[in-house]
Amino acid sequence: MAYSYEAPVSQSLFDRASVVTPGGVNSPVRAFRAVGGTPRFMVSGTGPYLTDADGREYVDLVCSWGPMILGHSHPEVIAAVQEAVSRGTSFGTPGEGEVALAEEIVARIEPVEQVRLVSSGTEATMSAIRLARGFTGRAKVVKFAGCYHGHVDALLAAAGSGVATFGLPDTPGVTGATAGDTVVLPYNDLEAVRAAFAAHPGEIACVITEASPGNMGVVPPADGFNAGLKELCAANGALYISDEVMTGFRTSKAGWYGVDGVRPDLMTFGKVMGGGFPAAAFGGRGDVMAHLAPAGPVYQAGTLSGNPVATAAGLAQLRLLDDAAYARIDAVSAGLRSLVGEALTKEGVAHTVSAASNMFSVFFTDRPVRDYEDAKQQDVFRFTAFFHSMLAQGVYLPPSAFESWFVSTAHDERAVERVAAALPAAARAAAEATA
């Protein structure tokens, strides 16, 4: 399908990038392969808006895939970064900023007794898995189809997100030996977890799950699912790892833990905690974290872990996220979900708007979506038409039907009105789309 609007400067940049970068991008979903057309190269962001290289402004409902919870270029975050940069960009030593950020995380997330800072969500989950194996002396890891935990080899099996976007069942380069200790189960199925423990007695080091998945679209845990995972892990000597890279500090002050109250053994964080910079963390029970080097035998390290600029940005952002901020984000999200649902209903488009706190996505099916298989049954071609209509009208959505939409405290009445104005035409485009 051809799209009538053009982005010549973005196209020129994409052509240049494609010569020197595989696929023209540094993260696959940015390439627009799932939706077609020219990926937009952004040059600036202010509040709820992005401006591309062609000078077009968009209401941003991606928020850098979650981190920009205060909107773009928040003055207090920018000031904190500028002050930190003025003192240097990296020292390779401990610094007060990393201590302060760790203290903030521990204060907000009650199950986290100690935390280790890293530079990406992938590093956080990779390190948490290694720590769980080292602590338990076991090898096997249970994960769920559709849950994405970064691009670490052992966790890419049935990983949702990028692999769902590109229709890949797995990825070349992950060996059978690497994936052999990974047990992949259907999401929201406690009986499958119980059966896995029975099939592998004394072998499972941990069960890892997105606290509330957002990488197959937003598919919240069924009532009692996370609590059931915790109980099964405790009964079988395994650790329960809650991946809050996406939900952490977004779905509440204490992330998804603040929503369901289930106490994990280990947790991973990223996105919001970095304030737009590469920063992430993993933490949890003190007795487990004590196994990390240099205190214990499980090795983990990183040259830029605890970077002073990243920790300054993250700390500034977290300190601005009070109860009022979350109330605002939740209200904006609820309003947008209602507007989207009304527009699609008016045009007779089968859909399900699924939310986890202020994260949400739209599945183009009217059937319940409880797991990865359900998510894949939607009419993705309708999302493609919807996406391009919104983009042409100045609303930037995730370029994939399998990703969460995000809002920020900066999404004001004007931004919401612009989204509302774009929805009728986008809903008609979805209704008229053909496979």
UniProtKB/Swiss-Prot annotation:
The modification N6-(pyridoxal phosphate)lysine is found at residue 271. Its main location: cytoplasm. One of its GO terms (molecular function) is pyridoxal phosphate binding. Its cofactor is pyridoxal 5'-phosphate. The keyword Isomerase applies. It catalyses: (S)-4-amino-5-oxopentanoate = 5-aminolevulinate. Belongs to the class-III pyridoxal-phosphate-dependent aminotransferase family. HemL subfamily. HAMAP family: HemL_aminotrans_3. This is Glutamate-1-semialdehyde 2,1-aminomutase. It comes from Streptomyces griseus subsp. griseus (strain JCM 4626 / CBS 651.72 / NBRC 13350 / KCC S-0626 / ISP 5235).
